[in-house]
Amino acid sequence: GDGQYKASLLPKLISPINKNKSEVVFGSRMLKPRDALKGNMPIYKFIGNIVITFIQNLFLRSKLSEFHSGYRVYSVKSLKQIPFQYNSNFFHFDTEIIIQFVIAKLKIFEIPIPTYYGLEWHANHIIYAIQVCLATLKAKIQKLGLIYDKKFDCDSKNTYFYISNENKNLESL
């Protein structure tokens, strides 16, 4: 990894799943926003994170403190409830999977984590922001019944199974 997230916090992230309090747990740098700045988060990323998260919460009617932290834990059960195999292979996969969890009405537990910035992320921030906003807008438009994308077909009653590319047998996660 890039050293942004403390491995020692992993047991704290896994705990709510092990205690059946949640199926999805996010480490959030924005539960204590001043700590994000103290951890050297660049101001443009800090402001961008707040603005984009606000837009996403507004469109999705969610209340997450952050959509853009990569420190997350998903239970197998949660992954069986969403069609994540249709998600992007690029950086905005992180937003698509959150949107799916929100649509599926899964409980998302957030835990404050410290911010550490060292090596710079090498993705184009503008393109990432556009992709994230477009995915969120698409999910909102689908909820209004104006379009359909199987990626956002996350009815909470669905269970998804995946075909292994290695042996072509139907298997559950």
Question: What would you call each of these model-derived segments?
Answer:
Residues 1-4:
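The conserved acidic donor/metal-binding loop of glycosyltransferases
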Residues 7-91, 118-127, 133:
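Acceptor/aglycone-binding surface of glycosyltransferases and processive sugar-polymer synthases
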Residues 12-18, 59-62, 85-173:
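Hydrophobic helical membrane-anchoring modules
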